[in-house]
Amino acid sequence: MLETILTTIYVYFASPLGLVELFGTIFSAICVYLAIKHNMWTWFFGALGVILFGYLFLQFGLYSDAGLQILFYLPMQLVGFFMWRRAAAKAETKSVVLALTLAQFALICFGIVGAAGVNGYLIATYTTGASFPYIDALTTWMSIAAQLLMIAKYRESWILWVAMDVIAIPVYYVKGMVVVSGLYVVFLVLATMGGIAWYRDYAEQNPNDTTEPGPGGEA
């Protein structure tokens, strides 16, 4: 049994797509870990993972995810690098973490659902071979919002990452992308750790803020 499993893993990762998935997984995991630490190298490893996963998603018919990787994530790695570098140059201590109000966060969530509904309908209506168009669109727009919030250093970005990971894990598993599904389990753990770390950083930077931790960190 063990020999069969090991043989299957070896054969999979020896294939071209298997290698793409493996290295994309490694680079992406490093990217998330460095983001938790406010390390600007996160954007370099993020760019490597984006390129590999963009290609991989195209092969599996996940067109929204592929477009997200190449048309949004890739340029955002450059934007994120320069914004974090500029913020680091201005900050005298640890990178400043910001917080949204409850109303702001709720508005963003409503916007995500609305955009995903329209996007999913267009994919389902005008494309062929798309897998899980509405769920694919939802994770796409959640990722876009989370990425923008992360670039701007809002702690709520991690809430969206956690929610997106929870949705993505079964989708990729059903699609047969077992390693990617496993990667998102790791991402889920890292995103949870990231949220805890950034909320703690915010509390340390704002000791007079007595609001309860959560999406509405500021009143």
Task: Cite the ranges covered by each PLM segment.
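Membrane-proximal helix-loop-helix units in multi-pass membrane proteins
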Residues: W84-M142
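Membrane-water interface of transmembrane alpha-helices
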Residues: L71-A89, Y199
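Short, strongly hydrophobic alpha-helical membrane anchors
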Residues: M1-L19
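Helix-coil boundary and interhelical linker segments in multi-pass alpha-helical membrane proteins
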Residues: L2, Y55-D65, L122-G129, Y173-V178
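Loop-to-transmembrane alpha-helix initiation sites
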Residues: D65, Q69, G176-F187
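Membrane-helix interface "capping/anchor" motifs
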Residues: Y33-F44, L148-L160
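Hydrophobic, membrane-inserted alpha-helices
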Residues: G24-C31, L48-G54, W141-A146, V162-P170
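Short, highly charged, low-complexity non-transmembrane loops/tails of multi-pass membrane proteins
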Residues: A203-A219
